[in-house]
Amino acid sequence: MPYLENSESSPDPTPLDAFHCLVQDINKVLGPSSGLDSDDVDPMDIQKLMEDYTSNESEWERYAFGDAGRAYTRNLVDEGNGKCNLLILVWSPGKGSAIHDHANAHCVMKVLKGSLRETLYGWPESDKVQKGEPSPLTVTRDKVYKEGQVTYMSDKLGLHKISNPDPTNFAISLHLYTPPNAAHYGFSLFDEKTGKSRHVKQSVLFSRKGHKL
């Protein structure tokens, strides 16, 4: 299976299986708009599409390349004509992301396999950070999402980190980012103890449309 190290991609799936129908439907919802910032697109529509999809590993495994030496890999599925990034992330056992923002974009995440823990934080107090004073981040939610569950995230809700709580098995998730701001302009990582941030370029893709880079 591709999310195991050094494995080969399986043959192209039937174009109209349920997963690729989901990809098509997401593009239809985004339509002529510039992404979920547009008034004519409701994030709930994307959430509903993802909730309605029943994960079938044979449909998406060709995109799910993993590397146990990394916390996670980013595997591009679709770019939505420049309006979004649709990615499959493969989370190594017991590892996770740093605390980060979403570069004024929207993120909808569905767990395809395993489970993922989301820890949500409030924003640091900007006046303290600007003065060089610590502003520790406060946890506002800590939740584990199981296979099939969907969640939504944006900067209006705060900051978060995602981790795979399973010490032995990979976890797989589908993420829609729209507009694809982080891919173009980068995003910020935050220190939990001080609240200080640093801007970074988006992590490189591990694979693109089923082909390992």
Swiss-Prot record:
One Pfam family here: CDO_I
Gene Ontology process terms (BP): L-cysteine catabolic process
Gene encoding the protein: CDO1
Keyword Metal-binding among record annotations: yes
EC number(s) stated in the UniProt entry for this protein: 1.13.11.20
Post-translational modification: The thioether cross-link between Cys-107 and Tyr-177 plays a structural role through stabilizing the Fe(2+) ion, and prevents the production of highly damaging free hydroxyl radicals by holding the oxygen radical via hydroxyl hydrogen.
Record-given protein name: Cysteine dioxygenase
Protein keywords: Dioxygenase, Iron, Metal-binding, Oxidoreductase, Thioether bond
Domain of life: Eukaryota
Cross-link (3'-(S-cysteinyl)-tyrosine (Cys-Tyr)): C107-Y177
GO terms assigned for molecular function: cysteine dioxygenase activity; ferrous iron binding
Cofactor needs: Fe cation
Catalytic activity: L-cysteine + O2 = 3-sulfino-L-alanine + H(+)
Entry coiled-coil feature ranges: none
UniProt remark on cofactor binding: Binds 1 Fe cation per subunit.
Enzyme class: oxidoreductase
Binding site for Fe cation: H100, H102, H160
Membership in a protein family: Belongs to the cysteine dioxygenase family.
